[in-house]
């Protein structure tokens, strides 16, 4: 639905899904004493309900998305095209996760306090990073729509506007975390010592100071994916994996916890070093293709 220009209804269904998830958590865990299984059932059930609601609404409101009898037949060209876009996206997250695992193994050698600090700081950081994922998803849709409509002149304008929004948000997020970071990290730990809170705040602030490079990672990577060049997403993930791996193997053992704090920022910068030239390459390639098509049509 977002690709069709409707982002409000998915948000409504997401809110409904979250409310159902909370209600089912209370019922399954507190009333039915199902424990971890109850939490899993609540999550799956709420997501299933949200998916069904989206499907029903989509079929009623968007005629172009209604599946006809003829469309039930498998189309190998379409399957190949979807796999060409989807498989690289899946591999991207897998490759990035490899670097994170190697880094985490290095952090584990620093002791329980360091592990707890990274865990608490990461949870707060991930909360603020949700906005970057939203910006990326927006640009994936925007890029795909404009490439499909052959309005390549709008790509740069959209990228600029989204980047400015992300930069402003990054500054605001850093200010919030600077003044309230320790308190926010304290919400995710029990029996928090001063050393733990100071370490988690250090981790949080160092990561937040590099949110602007993260803006470009999400905005450009998702946009390139939406433009149909998913392979570049894999390569950017490889750059992130290499950065985190090098930090985990060489930097963390020497510089300790502070070295671990700089792992993700370095990964984001490494990804940007690849993604920014990749965007201009992709855009020029599309422009050349469009010019050839116009010349042939004339």
Predicted feature residues:
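Small-residue-rich hydrophobic transmembrane alpha-helices
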Residues: 1-10, 115-181, 214-236
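Helix-terminus/linker motif at the lipid-water interface of multi-pass membrane proteins
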Residues: 27-34, 94-123, 127, 145, ...
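Short alpha-helical transmembrane segments in multi-pass integral membrane proteins
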Residues: 31-87, 143-210, 251-298
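Hydrophobic positions within alpha-helical transmembrane segments of bacterial inner-membrane proteins
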Residues: 18, 22, 26, 39, ...
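Short loop-to-helix capping motifs
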Residues: 6-7, 35, 111, 229-230, ...
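Alpha-helical transmembrane segments of multipass membrane proteins
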Residues: 19-30, 55, 101-105, 127, ...
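Short runs within selected transmembrane alpha-helices of multi-pass transporters and secretion channels
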Residues: 1-2, 10-18, 39-54, 133-136, ...
């Amino acid at each position: 639905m977002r690709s069709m220009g409707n982002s409000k209804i998915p948000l409504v269904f997401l809110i409904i899904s979250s409310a159902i998830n909370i209600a089912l958590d209370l019922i399954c865990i507190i009333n039915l004493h199902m424990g971890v299984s109850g939490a899993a059932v609540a999550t799956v059930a709420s997501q299933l309900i949200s998916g069904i609601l989206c499907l029903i609404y989509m079929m009623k409101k968007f005629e172009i998305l209604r599946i006809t009898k003829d469309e039930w037949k498998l189309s190998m060209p379409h399957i190949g095209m979807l796999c060409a876009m989807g498989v690289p996206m899946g591999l991207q997250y897998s490759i990035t996760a490899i670097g994170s695992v190697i880094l985490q193994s290095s952090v584990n050698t620093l002791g329980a306090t360091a592990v707890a600090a990274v865990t608490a700081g990461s949870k707060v950081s991930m909360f603020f990073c949700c906005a970057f994922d939203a910006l990326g998803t927006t640009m994936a849709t925007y890029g795909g729509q404009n490439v499909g409509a052959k309005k390549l002149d709008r790509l740069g304008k959209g990228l600029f506007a989204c980047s400015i929004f992300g930069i402003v948000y990054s500054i605001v997020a850093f200010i919030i975390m600077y003044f309230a970071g320790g308190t926010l990290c304290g919400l995710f730990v029990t029996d928090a010592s001063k050393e733990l809170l100071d370490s988690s705040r250090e981790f949080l602030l160092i990561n937040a100071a590099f949110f602007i490079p993260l803006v470009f990672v999400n905005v450009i990577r998702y946009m390139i994916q939406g433009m149909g060049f998913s392979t570049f997403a894999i390569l950017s993930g490889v750059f992130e994996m290499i950065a985190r791996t090098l930090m985990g193997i060489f930097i963390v053992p020497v510089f300790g916890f502070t070295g671990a704090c700089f792992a993700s920022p370095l990964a984001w910068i490494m990804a940007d070093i690849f993604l920014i030239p990749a965007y201009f390459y992709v855009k020029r390639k599309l422009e050349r293709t469009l010019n050839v098509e116009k010349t042939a049509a004339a």
